[in-house]
């Protein structure tokens, strides 16, 4: 029969998850190892996290010490689970929708996958990507640090007032 990506995702136990963050926070940190990450401002007062095609029990969303923490790194993974033979599984995507505020710090770390930051305002912005494209659109801040090992870097309407540090390998 024809290839069915949805059934393949089910066989790999991939799930879609949705979180609504009700606790207040002034900074955020998102750590992922294999997903496309999109962080964008929204015109609502509610912060939401949507994760698609994620292995079960691999994403945790908490607020600790006024910081939103999103951890999308599997806790116990065997070395051979990082390799996929044959057809690749559907791409995981994490979308964080933030209320339109000025945040103290926005920190994104991703091993494999694209990082997109849209319409976000923060004092300190820190982005680290090992493999994937980094795209910033309509960003303002005091300081910005971007490390991108493999992949393209796109900056559109980015205004940093004090210091910008970009490392592109």
Residue positions per predicted region:
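Acidic (Asp/Glu) and glycine-rich low-complexity loops/linkers
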Residues: 1-31, 36-110, 116-128, 135-148, ...
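Long, intrinsically disordered low-complexity tandem-repeat regions enriched in serine/threonine/proline
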Residues: 168-169
């Amino acid at each position: 029969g024809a290839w069915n990506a949805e059934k393949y995702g089910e066989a790999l136990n991939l799930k879609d998850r949705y979180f609504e963050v009700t606790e207040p926070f002034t900074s955020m940190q998102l750590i992922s190892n294999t997903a496309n990450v999109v962080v964008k401002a929204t015109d609502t007062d509610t912060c939401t996290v949507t994760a698609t095609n994620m292995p079960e029990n691999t994403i945790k969303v908490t607020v600790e010490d006024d910081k939103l923490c999103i951890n999308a790194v599997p806790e116990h993974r065997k070395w051979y689970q990082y390799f996929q033979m044959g057809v690749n599984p559907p791409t995981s995507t994490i979308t964080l929708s933030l209320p339109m505020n000025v945040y103290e710090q926005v920190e994104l770390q991703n091993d494999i996958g694209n990082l997109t930051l849209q319409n976000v305002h923060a004092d300190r912005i820190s982005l680290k990507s090992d493999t994937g494209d980094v795209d910033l659109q309509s960003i303002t801040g005091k300081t910005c640090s971007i490390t991108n090992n493999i992949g393209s870097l796109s900056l559109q309407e980015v205004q940093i007032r004090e210091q910008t540090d970009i490392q592109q390998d």
